[in-house]
Amino acid sequence: MPVDFVGIPAQKADMNQAAFFLYNSATHGREPFRPIDPKHVKIYVCGPTVYDLAHIGNARSMVVFDVLARVLRRLYPRVTYARNITDVDDKINARARESGVSIDEITARTTADFHADMASLGNLPPDIEPRATAHIAEMILLIEKLIAQEHAYETHGEGEGHVLFSVASDPSYGSLSNRSPDELLAGARIDPAPYKKDPGDFVLWKPSADDQPGWDSPWGRGRPGWHIECSAMSWRYLGEDFDIHGGGGDLIFPHHENECAQSRCAFPGSHFAHYWMHSAMLLLDGEKMSKSLGNVLTVRDLLGQADGEAIRLLFLKTHYRGVLDFRYEALKEAGKELDRFYRALQAHPALPDLDETVENPVLEALRDDLNTPQALSLMHGLAYAALGGDALAAAQLKEGGMLMGLFTREAEAWFQRGINPDEIAQRIADRLQARKDRNFAEADRIRNELAEAGILLEDGPSGTTWRRAS
């Protein structure tokens, strides 16, 4: 039985008692999802720090929570999905110094790049996308609450202008990441500071030099710490308690642990997020991506080599809690799988209406902790049936794929992606003329040239048609 997490009763999962099951990182177990208000589900997901292009590990997490939002919208009448933009951070400051470009220009450009990349992967925009710099007032108010309740303290002397959270004031600190006090201290020793009462105390507010971004506050001109930003923005838009908090697994400690502590302590009696979801790490050819290894692959780079829908499908083939080992061979295979899916849909241009009282088997799989591998397996079965003439299976395939953000275009558009139909039509006309002139060598050369480009010609009674090679 999973342990209780800060007063929230741990639930035993029973498929007969609940419609939707999630793995809750807070209780370290799979549980039935029971929203605070079944009429309005609220989600908060940690978004990007906008100093550089998103890499494929970032993108995987965003795809996971896009699918979550889509499924929740299918199951509940109203969903509010908030995902922040961190536009004040020391990494942004450093990038501005290195590049000689203003912070505003860097954050604006990188935010636009992020939006474009996410759209290319089929992600819908969140309902709310707050920027940290637009919520400094809420952060200051939250810090004042923590000081008033003796969960935070202002420093003087050497650390003048800092406000720190006191981890000793929160008996539940460490419960989210399931870390012992010794483990927490070991992490804190990486960057000790003499003005801390406890090595594990973390920054809520810090002073800014003249050349750094800063805002006036009761503690002098300064800027917020990383963790307080998300606490303030989730509070502003979702309230003291909300349903689901998501992010990458690398954020569990210290970011989510600290976020959770701040919010619980600022609002006594609240639970903050009732469910915590985390996507696992992504490896690149078996190795962890890192700048020191020089193997960080950005979404933008990958989109230059593959279609965004194929990248999305590849992400979904591994369960979100499983480590995904990204390999180019697997990406190519994902493209072929999409060919098959779209071929099945293309065979049924007019899809029948589905019986709303009969649940799509794909949705049934997604109810089980977003089991996307199982959902895709079922979709392959539906595609097989659709290719055999089953129009109902084709309709279920289309609906199931859209639940996962797939099939966002018509089949014809998928097969013609990256292709200029006018150029192909001209080459077909050239080949036809060569055949009329009995220049069969030239006709064969044109056919072979198109085949090498992935275009197959098919001669029939009504003329020559073409299709993309599977």
From Swiss-Prot:
Specify whether Transport is a keyword of the entry: no
Q: What GO annotations for molecular function exist for this entry?
A: ATP binding; cysteine-tRNA ligase activity; zinc ion binding
Keywords carried by this UniProt record: Aminoacyl-tRNA synthetase, ATP-binding, Cytoplasm, Ligase, Metal-binding, Nucleotide-binding, Protein biosynthesis, Zinc
Residues where ATP binds = 291
Q: What's the short name of a Pfam family annotated to this entry? A: CysS_C
- InterPro entries attached here? Cys-tRNA-ligase, Cys-tRNA-synt_Ia_DALR, Cys-tRNA/MSH_ligase, CysS_C, Rossmann-like_a/b/a_fold, tRNA-synt_1_cat_dom, tRNAsynth_Ia_anticodon-bd
Query: Which superkingdom heads the taxonomic lineage of this protein's source?
Result: Bacteria
Where does the record say this protein resides? Cytoplasm
The scientific name of the source species is: Granulibacter bethesdensis (strain ATCC BAA-1260 / CGDNIH1)
Task: Locate the coiled-coil region(s) and give their ranges.
Answer: none
Locate the motif 'HIGH' region.
48-58
Motif 'KMSKS' region location, chain numbering: 288-292
Describe how the cofactor binds. Binds 1 zinc ion per subunit.
- The record's gene field reads cysS
Q: What is the lineage of its organism?
A: Bacteria, Pseudomonadati, Pseudomonadota, Alphaproteobacteria, Acetobacterales
Q: Which PANTHER family match?
A: CYSTEINE--TRNA LIGASE, CYTOPLASMIC, CYSTEINYL-TRNA SYNTHETASE
Record EC number: 6.1.1.16
Name this protein carries in UniProt: Cysteine--tRNA ligase
GO BP: cysteinyl-tRNA aminoacylation
